[in-house]
UniProtKB/Swiss-Prot annotation:
EC assignment: 6.1.1.17
Keyword match ATP-binding: yes
CDD domains associated with the record: GluRS_core (cd00808)
Catalytic activity line of the entry: tRNA(Glu) + L-glutamate + ATP = L-glutamyl-tRNA(Glu) + AMP + diphosphate
Name of the protein this chain belongs to: Glutamate--tRNA ligase
UniProt function note: Catalyzes the attachment of glutamate to tRNA(Glu) in a two-step reaction: glutamate is first activated by ATP to form Glu-AMP and then transferred to the acceptor end of tRNA(Glu).
Main location: cytoplasm
Assigned GO CC terms: cytosol
Gene: gltX
Span(s) of short sequence motif 'HIGH' region: 11-21
């Protein structure tokens, strides 16, 4: 009988949820959901100096924002140290591990000698079969695995294919340090086994770890999980992903105005493909996702593609939900509190009314908020340089006449204000554009905006007449 699928995401809380970590979590989540299994979350907090509660909170918050949920309680690796030590002692008792009394100076000399001779194996195994009675006084021993000396260690990886390491090149890895703390290699294996993990999906920078960890599985006679080591994310130029490329925390993408659904869609296509399909609903991702469809070569991060995809998701979004997303965004941007103070039911209603025109022009929520700025701007409007250039003395006189032409319009709608403006332009012998642009500048402070008659309708009669008065001669 096939075991139910159990995946896990196991970040180290030494910083934010990196974009690569977000993709790893997504792949684990998709695979578990596709197979009706579970995805577990383990915080690998054994590095006590670098692990912080702030980082843990950022990871949990980032996963929730991405829409990635996990099953069961979060497991904290450090809390399981006693169990890790227990397994090391089991291996010791079974003769599959040994105490190593090599001093720090001796280990340094061994490494230097091995490197000078071009050998991959840095530890010479001098305590492997040595009598502990020969131990020097005052040295706290480590516990090392008795790794096989000949043959090879093989992983049949779902992404990388068959990967083999010659055992003669692999050290007897340390399981317990001299102070009794378990190493990462041991802790990961024990936790994955005890948590019932069936599939380990992680970055291919962990591939060398897989060889070490398989040796522990073999020594304990435990079943090895299915392994899938996914390619790392590189910058557009093929170099290692850096901050200028997009090596940011998931929280930074939220603050830049990306939608969770758009980022999920973009991340799933980084290294995985399903024919030529680019846009996926979450359910389509779950249905289509499979490990063999992940490529081996590094995926390249492309901000332009992410922006384009995000723009698609914005245009497809419901107007009311976009207003909610805009309001939520304010918590994460520097100017947010000042704008949030202006949000009331009237502003929300105006934003919803303007949204059909606003969302066609925006690729991010930041752009959307910026384009909507005229709705909650304070009077008198701050004009951008292009708008200032439009407002000549003659234009200001024209704005005064426009205001007079609009004063008696009733009811105040996009259609009625358009009719009034067209009549004014015809009477004045002007093209509609010559009338619309000064009107746009006076009402929005910019030379670009949604349709000018939509702007008139959204702002309402009193606000429009007041803004026109501010800019008229």
């Amino acid at each position: 009988m096939t075991r139910p699928v159990v995946t896990r995401f196991a970040p180290s809380p030494t910083g934010f949820l990196h974009i690569g970590g977000g993709r790893t979590a997504l792949f684990n989540w998709l695979y578990a959901r596709k197979h009706g299994g579970t995805m577990l979350l383990r915080i690998e907090d054994t590095d006590r100096q670098r692990s912080t509660q702030e980082a843990i909170d950022a990871i949990l918050d980032g996963l929730k924002w991405l829409g990635i949920d996990w099953d069961g309680a979060t497991v904290y690796q450090f809390a399981r140290a006693a169990r890790h030590r227990e397994v090391a002692e089991q291996l010791l008792a079974a003769g599959k591990a040994y105490r190593c009394y090599a001093t720090a100076e001796e280990l340094t000399a061994m490494r230097d000698k091995a490197r000078a001779e071009g050998r991959a194996k840095l530890y010479d195994g001098s305590w492997r079969d040595r009598d502990p009675s020969e131990a020097p006084a005052g040295v706290k021993p480590t516990i090392r695995l008795k790794a096989p000396l000949t043959g090879e260690t093989v992983i049949e990886d779902q992404v990388q294919g068959r990967v083999a390491w010659q055992n003669e090149n692999l050290d007897d890895l340390v399981l317990l340090r001299g102070d009794g703390t378990p190493t990462y290699m041991l802790a990961v294996v024990v936790d994955d086994h005890d948590m019932g993990v069936t599939h380990v999906i992680r970055g291919d920078d962990h591939l060398i770890n897989a060889a070490r960890q398989k040796q522990i599985y073999d020594a304990m006679e435990w079943e090895l999980p299915v392994m899938a080591h996914i390619p790392l994310i590189h910058g557009p130029d093929g170099s290692k992903l850096s901050k200028r490329h997009g090596a940011l925390g998931v929280d930074a993408y939220r603050a830049m105005g990306y939608l969770p659904a758009a980022l999920r869609n973009y991340l799933v296509r980084l290294g995985w493909s399903h024919g030529d399909q680019e846009i996926f609903t979450t359910q389509e991702m779950i249905d289509a996702f499979d490990l063999p469809a992940i490529g081996r070569s590094a995926a390249r991060f492309d901000f332009a593609k992410l922006e384009s995809l995000n723009g698609h998701y914005i245009r497809q979004s419901d107007d009311h939900s976009l207003v909610t997303l805009l309001e939520d965004l304010l918590k994460y941007i520097p100017q947010g509190p000042a704008i949030a103070a202006k949000f009331d039911d009237s502003i929300r209603a105006k934003l919803t009314q303007a949204m059909p025109g606003l969302k066609e022009r925006a690729k991010t929520l930041i752009e959307l908020l910026d384009n909507a700025g005229f709705i909650f701007a304070d009077r008198p409007l701050a004009l951008d340089p292009k708008a200032q250039a439009v407002l000549t003395p003659e234009t200001r006189q024209l704005i005064g006449r426009l205001r007079a032409a609009l004063e008696d319009v009733s009811p105040w709608t996009a259609a009625t204000t358009e009719a009034a403006m067209r009549a004014f332009a015809e009477q004045a012998g002007l093209k509609l554009g010559a009338v619309a642009q000064p009107l746009r500048v006076a009402l929005t402070g910019r030379t670009t905006s949604p349709g000018i008659f939509d702007v008139l309708a959204v702002l309402g009669r009193d606000e429009c007449l007041s803004r026109l008065a501010d800019q008229s001669a």
